Amino acid sequence: MSDPIRTKPKSSMQIDNAPTPHNTPASVLNPSYLKNGNPVRAQAQEQDDKIGTINEEDILANQPLLLQSIQDRLGSLVGQDSGYVGGLPKNVKEKLLSLKTLQSELFEVEKEFQVEMFELENKFLQKYKPIWEQRSRIISGQEQPKPEQIAKGQEIVESLNETELLVDEEEKAQNDSEEEQVKGIPSFWLTALENLPIVCDTITDRDAEVLEYLQDIGLEYLTDGRPGFKLLFRFDSSANPFFTNDILCKTYFYQKELGYSGDFIYDHAEGCEISWKDNAHNVTVDLEMRKQRNKTTKQVRTIEKITPIESFFNFFDPPKIQNEDQDEELEEDLEERLALDYSIGEQLKDKLIPRAVDWFTGAALEFEFEEDEEEADEDEDEEEDDDHGLEDDDGESAEEQDDFAGRPEQAPECKQS
């Protein structure tokens, strides 16, 4: 629903893959070779045959300063106006201006579409909530699953071949009274979070102890006229020895104006203050006790040295942009942290909360890997297509061209997703 985070200030943004007016067509400036052929190619080929082929890669590899200079010059040309648009006739420019007006009207319609989509998502969120609430009660042990739910679940896992969840005949015959009754599903949300790739690396051993008391993760959409969403982490405060909060929340805000692609753009996030019971239970800091002796009185006192450390619970204290004049390396580090923070929020909203049981069992990982493999295959296909295109530009032997002569033209293959 939203664009990836814009990590660069607007002043430094450039258009990727600039459209044709920024890269002037060769046919506009020079006579085309398509009909007349390249007048110097045959002569150059004869000279190459006489003196041998120069390997440009070897030359550049042996002269890194030259290579860097070329790269810098090429980089400065990206997005530069070639003058093509400026040289167009007046009546063509007027037509382009009218197209700009029409495009601005399209932006308004797209904004209306996104706003209504947001309202539709919020409408269906109200239908999700009763289901999520029952899920939460079963996880925490406040409610027992109904027999028909168990039977339906058995059919589902059989169809998906998730054999680990199947209850065999011996287990069915076992008397519930003979089996130790476990309240709810222990470590449900901790296990689900640790199976989500983008989150697992942020959870330390100390974090895991705290997340044992996590009872539910909820979602709300903002309805105060500004697009965004809120994640709510509900803890068992009566048993939690680490902090007193019942709920930890994280709110993500989108910009009011749409991005160029017609989607909402991430603006910023706001966390909440965690009321740790004491520094010893605060998993976001490292506590070191030091003894200090007074030189005059010779009295000894104990002081605490507190050092901030990496922790999942830093998620509730999101990174903030301090000023525009900060060091470039610090700016890049901040951008990476902002991008990671935004990605975690989106994946919790779009992946973890709707499919929590599959992240607990690990079944969701199989679908995740399948999607990654499909994307990798598509990237490889595109690279192969590009390679074939380059080969065609270099020219083919007469024998290869004759192989295709006289064959009926085949229809392009349809890719199915």
Curated annotation (Swiss-Prot):
Keywords: Cytoplasm, DNA-binding, Isopeptide bond, Nucleus, Phosphoprotein, Ubl conjugation
Keyword Signal annotated: no
Residues the record lists as Phosphoserine modifications: 27, 69, 76, 82, 98, 104, 140, 159, 177, 397
GO biological process: budding cell bud growth; NLS-bearing protein import into nucleus; nucleosome assembly; nucleosome disassembly; positive regulation of microtubule polymerization; positive regulation of transcription elongation by RNA polymerase II; protein localization to cell division site after cytokinesis; ribosomal small subunit biogenesis
DNA-binding region: 330-356
Localization per Swiss-Prot or TrEMBL: Cytoplasm; Nucleus; Bud neck
SUPFAM superfamilies linked to this entry: NAP-like
Effect of residue 159 to A: Significant reduction in phosphorylation. Complete inhibition of phosphorylation. Leads to a prolonged S phase and a shortened passage through G1. Predominantly cytoplasmic
Phenotype upon loss of function: Exhibits a large proportion of multinucleate cells. Elongated buds. The percentage of elongated buds is significantly increased when GIN4 or CKI1 is also deleted. Small decrease in the percentage of cells with elongated buds is observed in NAP1 and CKA2 double mutant. NAP1 and CKI1 double mutant exhibits increased sensitivity to benomyl. Increased resistance to benomyl in NAP1 and CKA2 double mutant.
PTM remark: Phosphorylation by CK2 is required for normal progression through S phase. CK2 phosphorylation is not required for correct bud formation nor histone binding.
Note: Present with 8070 molecules/cell in log phase SD medium.
Protein name from the UniProt record: Nucleosome assembly protein
Gene: NAP1
